[in-house]
């Protein structure tokens, strides 16, 4: 992932590296200033901030953590048994883990051996040296605020020596990049793509309402839960901004060439995450627009002195007003993301906002349908040049017409073209956010309120029971867990 110095992104370095176990090069240097202490990560999340969350209140994982915190007074690394490493990234490693006895036993637990969790472990001293500690803090602060079916649940966060640990839910289905490799032709069908893209849109919509610009959407970061629904992951590249609720009328003038009013500018703020969205909008009144007539005529001759019939007709035909609570005017100049997913405005350094998430949604959708990204070149430099200069092209898929996908594919291509508009001001979603994207014909028939009730294209098999063999880590392995590749099962201490 890539980033350049930008004050609102808390960056003070420029570094380039390739993350392990990644098929794409990453560039990233959103770090922390040298004044940020490696000990500023904080201890275990207080019980008050680990409240029951509406979407996860009945989970066995929540109940087990609640009982642990009530009995032990805190949650720490000593309460967990690490099973195996799930993956690694720029900041640290993620381990599959479960609670130790007696905390693992629960009447709500259905998994053999207790509830499974994913624990992200980062070395604070190493991140402070690389000036990237702030990124880890941003991710933690964002995770603490999230409560959405398609976003991670943070069960606990704590420190162990110079390590910071985030305990989140485990997704046994892997990620969509791996899932795509299993599909015929290594691509998803249009119907499967619609399902995953729709859930991703809802996740982005919620993030934007919370003032979070994700900036790292790609199949590798879209995980599959045990029920087959998705979960976005990795928020260390996200940008936190203010959002101001706005009531806007969709551009009925889309055909007439007009534009709806823009919301007031958003301001980027340090990630002391405080949700600014209120359920009660005060002082917001509907705007009654005068009817616009092209070329004069009888309506123009009225001069607004009619008997009100025109106003009633306008009310009947006008698009309903939409509440827009998204950082559509947020601006950042950080160079952050994965090469193949970078938006043109990020590459050019002109400054970017939440529209970059809709660009990456277009690239994400393209890769799901065609098995590759639209602008990939022979090198990273060529890829960036293609993003800036080359138009979007769509390869012909053998068997698409026979499978009855041709018309659906044309609608999907239209959506991708609008999402991949190089001018962010003309990009779908740049003005009214997710409301514009959800209205596209590609999503015709999608009941957005009941997406969670739709059967996913694939439901992963239950995770296999953990092996009985237990390995004890050496002192060196305890001190450097990020360099240790466990084979089966081990005790951390």
Swiss-Prot record:
InterPro entries, per the entry: Kinase-like_dom_sf (IPR011009), Prot_kinase_dom (IPR000719), Ser/Thr_kinase_AS (IPR008271)
Pfam families, A to Z: Pkinase (PF00069)
Residue span, AGC-kinase C-terminal domain: 444-493
Compositionally skewed regions (Gly residues) per UniProt: 295-306
Compositional bias annotation for Low complexity: 27-44
Listed Acidic residues bias regions: 307-319
Active site: residue positions: 216
UniProt keyword list: ATP-binding, Auxin signaling pathway, Developmental protein, Kinase, Nucleotide-binding, Serine/threonine-protein kinase, Transferase
Region of interest called Disordered, as start-end residue ranges on this chain: 1-53, 295-320, 458-493
Binding site for ATP: 86-94, 120
One CC-aspect GO term: cytoplasm
PANTHER family hit by this protein: FLIPPASE KINASE 1-RELATED
Physiological role: Serine/threonine-protein kinase involved in the regulation of auxin signaling.
Protein name as catalogued: Protein kinase PINOID 2
């Amino acid at each position: 992932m890539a980033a350049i110095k930008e004050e609102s992104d808390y960056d003070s370095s420029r570094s380039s590296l390739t993350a392990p176990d990644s098929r794409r090069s990453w560039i990233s240097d959103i770090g922390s200033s040298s004044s940020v202490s490696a000990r500023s990560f904080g201890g275990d999340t207080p019980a008050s901030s680990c409240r029951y969350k509406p979407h996860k209140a009945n989970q066995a994982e929540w109940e087990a953590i609640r009982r642990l915190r009530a009995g032990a007074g805190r949650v720490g690394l000593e309460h967990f048994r690490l099973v195996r490493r799930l993956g690694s990234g720029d900041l640290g490693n993620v381990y599959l883990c479960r609670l130790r006895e007696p905390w693992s036993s629960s009447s709500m637990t259905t998994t053999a051996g207790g509830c499974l969790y994913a624990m992200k472990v980062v070395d604070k001293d190493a991140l402070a040296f690389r000036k990237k500690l702030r990124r880890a803090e941003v991710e933690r602060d964002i995770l603490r605020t999230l409560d959405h079916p398609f976003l991670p649940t943070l069960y606990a966060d704590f420190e162990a020596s110079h390590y910071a640990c985030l305990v989140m839910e485990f997704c046994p289905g892997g990620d969509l990049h791996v899932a795509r490799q299993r599909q015929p032709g290594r691509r998803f069908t249009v119907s499967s793509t619609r399902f995953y893209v729709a859930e991703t849109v809802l996740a982005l919509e919620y993030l934007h309402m919370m003032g979070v610009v994700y900036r790292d959407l790609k199949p590798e970061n879209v995980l599959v839960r045990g029920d087959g629904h998705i979960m976005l992951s990795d928020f260390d590249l996200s940008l936190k901004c203010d959002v101001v609720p706005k009531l806007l009328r969709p551009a009925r003038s889309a055909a007439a060439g007009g534009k709806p009013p823009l919301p007031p500018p958003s301001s980027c703020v340090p990630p002391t995450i405080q949700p600014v969205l209120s359920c009660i909008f005060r002082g917001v009144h509907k705007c009654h627009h005068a009817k616009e007539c092209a070329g004069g005529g009888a309506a123009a001759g009225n001069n607004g002195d009619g008997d009100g019939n025109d106003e009633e007709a306008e009310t009947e035909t006008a698009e309903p007003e939409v509440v827009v609570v998204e950082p559509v005017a947020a601006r950042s100049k950080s160079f952050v993301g994965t090469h193949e997913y970078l938006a043109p405005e990020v590459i050019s350094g002109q400054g970017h906002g939440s529209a970059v998430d809709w660009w990456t949604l277009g690239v994400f959708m393209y890769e799901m349908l065609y098995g590759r990204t639209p602008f990939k070149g022979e090198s990273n430099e060529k890829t960036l040049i293609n993003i800036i200069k080359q138009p979007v092209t769509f390869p012909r898929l053998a068997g698409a017409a026979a499978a009855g996908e041709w018309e659906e594919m044309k609608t999907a291509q239209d959506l991708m073209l609008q999402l991949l508009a190089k001018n962010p001001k003309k990009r779908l979603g740049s003005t009214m956010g997710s409301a514009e994207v959800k209205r596209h014909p590609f999503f015709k028939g999608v009941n957005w309120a009941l997406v969670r009730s739709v059967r996913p294209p694939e439901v992963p098999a239950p995770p296999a029971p953990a092996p009985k063999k237990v390995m004890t880590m050496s002192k060196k392995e305890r001190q450097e867990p990020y360099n240790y590749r466990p084979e089966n099962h081990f005790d951390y201490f």
